[in-house]
Amino acid sequence: MRILVCISNVPDTTTKVKFTDNNTKFDPTGVQWVINPWDELALTRALELKEDASAGVKSVTVAHVGLADSEPTIRKALAIGADDAIRINQLPIDAYQVAAQLAEAIKAEPYDIIMCGIESSDFNGSTVGSMVAEFLGYPSVSAASGLIIESGAAIITREIDGGKETLSVPTPFVAIVQKGIAKEPRIAAMRGIMQARTKPIKVIEPIAVEPLTELVTFEPPQPRAKCVMVAADNPKQIIELLQNEAKVISVSY
């Protein structure tokens, strides 16, 4: 059995992002790029399954749509434990385009399980995984919080209101995973980092796919209001702040 994990290259959540050209373009200057956290959890679970001899997983591959400057993120996935990687050589523009490129690459190799994070931490679209499944004609399970393999059969657990749902899914299939699929992402050890330098990254030229959406503008969030400490025995100051600063009350004298 072979597993492929789709990964995204996203800004670290601690990075202060900036926009240019009247908020129509993302400025990558100084940005620290990382594996999308949801995809990292998917990779962790895939590696756990590979290490479980009873699961019968022979290899774990990661696939990514991006240009050459995204390869450090791919190398991190290899350092964590992936056996090899595929990079589709195209700048990701929208979910449809990314899913189409991933599906085309997957068609060329016989993978049994395709895993995707439920969303990316930058755009939060939650659509790539289901689109990949549709392009491939594979069954898919969304919001998967558990995945085991018993006697060659995949068993997936989903969190639902009031309990859990357990499904048996025939291979090949797409699992769109969320929190719970793994306890925490793995940290690359020094040995893994050294080995990642020589692990193969297969570069594939993209197929012709037109994005279905167009980015119009970014809108940064409003700055957070300042925090003002007020003594509990000073109700007059509290009223003044609520009236003049927060502007949530109106006081008549």
How should each PLM-predicted stretch be described?
Residues 1-253:
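N-terminal glycine-rich FAD/FM-binding segment characteristic of electron-transfer flavoproteins
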